[in-house]
């Protein structure tokens, strides 16, 4: 990754990373869940949709078998390439819609955002070698199909080792107060995805809850079971969100 500078070596106005790097220290841990669709480069349709709309969702998520999964060899090649580069991908899985996939990318500090950007680049490059496209739009297919998000798990030192129910709930309340500002930075066309359906909260509303996949912020069972030491999951960011902007916002908005 490189930063953009002007001819006089000052930070270019488009360089959001410089400001983020000053506040997003290694105390902050991020786990990005990057969702996307593999696509036919000629038609733009998701892989597996060549003969029309496939059967409804239900058997594709973490599925096995040629009738349930397409693109696994590409996902596996991407995983191996990222690991060789030192990018910590912690897992992959077929997602809810046919042709939709996810990988999880973990990192500390601003490197988390850098690694997600590089992993996206590698995803497009490796898919190209297979003659396949990639779509990270948050709602490539309308109708009764899940969109694609960038659910983000995050924590700082206090959350991991000095947590309490009061701390986590106060963080959620604070995030609720700046919900509109956050949404503006969570990717384009996110209103098509955050409808209140398909495991989302409405874009105009904010909520949080324990193990609630329909909430804006999910408090994981892991956190509760570890005496309120752990992390939060922000389910609002779209699959095309900028991880640099996200980490910068999080370091500002979540602090007491």
Regions found by a protein language model. Give the residues of each.
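Short, conserved charged micro-motifs
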Residues: 10-12, 114, 160-164, 242-243
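Loop-rich catalytic cores of soluble enzymes, especially ATP-dependent carboxylate-amine ligases
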Residues: 102-113, 128-235
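Generic non-transmembrane alpha-helical segments
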Residues: 74-85, 122-130, 170-178
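Conserved small/polar residues in nucleotide/adenosyl-binding loops
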Residues: 247-254
């Amino acid at each position: 990754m490189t930063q953009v500078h002007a001819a006089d070596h000052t930070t270019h106005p488009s360089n959001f990373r410089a400001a983020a790097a000053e506040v997003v220290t290694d105390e902050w841990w991020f786990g990005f869940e990057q969702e996307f669709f593999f696509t036919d480069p000629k038609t733009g349709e998701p892989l597996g949709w060549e003969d029309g709309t496939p059967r409804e969702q239900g058997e594709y998520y973490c599925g096995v078998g040629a009738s349930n999964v397409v693109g696994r060899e590409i996902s596996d090649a991407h995983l191996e390439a990222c690991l060789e580069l030192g990018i910590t991908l912690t897992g992959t899985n077929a997602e809810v819609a046919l042709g939709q996939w996810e990988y999880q990318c973990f990192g500390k500090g601003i490197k988390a955002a850098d690694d997600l950007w590089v992993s996206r680049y590698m995803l497009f490059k490796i898919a190209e070698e297979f003659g396949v496209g990639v779509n990270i739009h948050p709602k490539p297919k309308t109708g009764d199909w899940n969109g694609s998000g960038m659910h983000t798990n995050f924590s700082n030192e206090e959350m991991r080792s000095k947590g309490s129910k009061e701390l986590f709930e106060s963080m959620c309340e604070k995030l609720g107060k700046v919900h509109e500002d956050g949404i503006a930075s969570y990717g384009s066309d996110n209103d098509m995805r955050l409808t209140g359906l398909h495991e989302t909260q409405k874009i105009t509303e904010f909520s949080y809850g324990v193990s609630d996949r329909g909430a804006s912020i999910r408090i994981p069972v892991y956190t509760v079971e570890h005496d309120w030491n752990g992390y939060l999951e922000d389910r609002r960011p779209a699959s095309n969100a900028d991880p640099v902007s996200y980490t910068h916002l999080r370091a500002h908005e979540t602090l007491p």
